Regions:
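Long, distal/terminal scaffolding or interaction modules
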Residues: 1-281
Length: 281
């Protein structure tokens, strides 16, 4: 079945259609209907514009290409499974939640509270402007993500990020089993209370990073403006260049070309030791 060049505004306009192509349609109009594609299966959606709320709910097996979801298209994808979005624009708040097996490729996203409670989310070559993204999501792979947002990746588990630029704050709090390769992470208070965070060839920018962490590993990373780093953390870090200051690390080893100040004061945890090495040239 093919639905082409239609303007639809009814409630559940194409409810539960299966094995269909939806091409060049606009979901907008005075009826202001919600949930246009709810419960659809095996659909291909191409070149459509979504201006109404909740279009993709409980959808299974969809390919969505060159579509626009405007600012008024709130909560666009919830409770979905196995959807691939390519060259799409997502502009409404809470655009992705409680979904599984989602792929986003070359998408532009402006959405607060994006990507909550998702499982197996893959993003490649995407731009994301957001606040509070990826809360409690797991099993994610992100490559070439350009992100601007606050409070990102909190409580996430089993995440791999590559070649990305993350401009954020309070990122990776309470995260578990996250690895980041070849990326820039900018923002204060990075990864407090994280567990098994590994940063490889990354540049870290911002005050008071990586505190209260367990199993923290940094390999061949750079640190810029990172004062009061590693407080109460179990850390194994090899830093290229200097660290502005290190305060009361709990255990492990920190190796750098220079450290502006090492603060070991009366608040240091007793009966613990972290080896701090300044490499000579």
């Amino acid at each position: 079945m093919k639905y082409e060049n239609l303007t639809l505004d009814e409630e559940r306009a194409l409810y539960a259609v299966q094995d269909a192509e939806i091409i060049g349609c606009t979901f907008s109009g005075p009826a202001d209907g919600e949930s246009a594609l709810k419960e659809c299966r095996n659909i291909q959606v191409k070149g459509c514009t979504f201006q109404l709320r909740y279009p993709f709910r409980h959808v299974r097996h969809a390919v969505v290409e060159h579509c626009t979801m405007t600012e008024t298209c709130r909560a666009a994808l919830w409770y979905d499974n196995n959807i691939t979005l390519t060259h799409c624009t997502l502009g409404g708040i809470k655009a992705l939640r409680e979904c599984k097996d989602i792929v986003l490729d070359s998408c532009a996203i402006n959405s607060t509270e994006f990507g909550w409670f998702c499982d197996h989310l893959h993003m490649t070559n995407c731009e994301l402007k957001t606040e509070y993204p990826f809360l409690k999501s797991c099993n994610m792979e992100l490559d070439h993500l350009s992100m601007q947002g606050k409070y990102s990746f909190q409580y996430v588990e089993n995440v791999v990020i590559r070649n990305s630029n993350l401009d954020t704050k309070d990122a990776f709090w309470h995260s578990k089993n996250v690895t980041v390769y070849d990326s820039i992470i900018k923002g204060e208070y990075l990864a407090w209370y994280s567990e098994n965070l590994k940063l490889v060839r990354c540049k870290i920018i911002g005050t008071q990073p990586l505190c209260y962490a367990k199993g923290l590993v940094l390999e061949d990373c750079e640190m810029d403006g990172t004062d009061l780093a590693f407080e109460y953390s179990d850390v194994h870090a090899v830093i290229n260049g200097s660290i502005e200051s290190v305060k009361n690390p709990k255990s492990g080893i920190i190796s750098a070309d220079g450290i502006g100040e090492v603060i070991l004061d009366e608040h240091q945890i007793r009966d613990t030791h972290c080896e701090i090495c300044i490499r000579s040239h």
